[in-house]
């Protein structure tokens, strides 16, 4: 058999003048070599053959074929179908890519000597599949209609630790679901979210991605996340923990993000090893953002430093007891866009501490300098704006409704007016001083304190 395979290799080498690619198939992995990449084909007796610096044991080769197809250099294509998965690796990087397939579970390790970035295209459907990748180079991941449900870990786990470009291919629907059999208290990355990224990721493409975080988060990212202009739709349909759990910083420039979570909607943690100016910040500059959370003592959006909102259409609805809409230890600056925040829970006691359902909470200044800001904080002790420092109404259109009053600084550049003991019915429209806010059906307050500035 080995001699037959060797003969086939020789025939492939000399008999494919009109063809374009030599496919070497080992199990579920195909290595695709162009004609010029087979010039240095070398045999070691009848045991192995080396093509483009990758050695193959002849006994491991299932099939060889010369096909009239092209494959781009520096690419890896992964296709799922039910309980199986197939991988095609471009020949020029064959020596650097080690790929394994078990059923529909794919593991790819890129060698540290890999000279260039690789583009991975992932597509297909599996109800019992996953994708894992590790390496040392920046990478591009094209989600080209990928639906994965992994019973016992993250559906997609990228561990390269470098710049990762995530592309939602135009017109595609992608869905990742992690497993209910995972251990929620397991500290390993594979159990942190439906999608795990160890690296800094930048997102683009007009497609759609839906995440189902049945164990913890929808997305866990160990470094910054940037959502670029023109991005399509990212939906966290469910998350037992946080919708988006991001380290370093989160920046949204565009796209549409919808989050439904029991934990925090977006949680941004500062990274001790980061020297980025934005470390710990949550930055919203554009796009459409909708967050709904329902847990006790959680936040719609929180971060470890400043929160900066300069654009976009942003809606944060928080229904859990003791939970807040926006929360940051640093300053919260709103300079543009339209932001609506609603909290409806009651005061809660957590570990002996009283937690109040405020709308916007900062340990530093809250500056409302532009855009539109509408806040309806819980009638049970919630303030629209609560701070340990100062509130400034510096030019934004503001209406803040709460169970307790919010009082801006006298140093504010724009005047403000306060009203008290106002009956705000569920779903009603509240208008004062030319500012109008239609509160949702889930909110009511029979003795509201209202702040208005324009």
Feature annotation, model-predicted:
Residues 4-13:
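Sec-dependent N-terminal signal peptides
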Residues 15-19:
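Sec/Tat signal peptide C-region and signal peptidase I cleavage site
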Residues 20-22, 45-48, 115-122:
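Short, hydrophobic/aromatic-rich segments at coil-to-beta transitions
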Residues 20-38:
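Short N-terminal segments immediately surrounding and downstream of signal-peptide cleavage
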Residues 20-24, 47-51, 427-432:
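Short polybasic amphipathic segments
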Residues 34-43, 57-69:
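Structured surface patches comprising rigid loops and adjacent beta-strands/short helices at the edges
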Residues 55-60, 390-393:
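Extracellular interaction modules
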Residues 69-454:
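A composition-driven surface/loop motif
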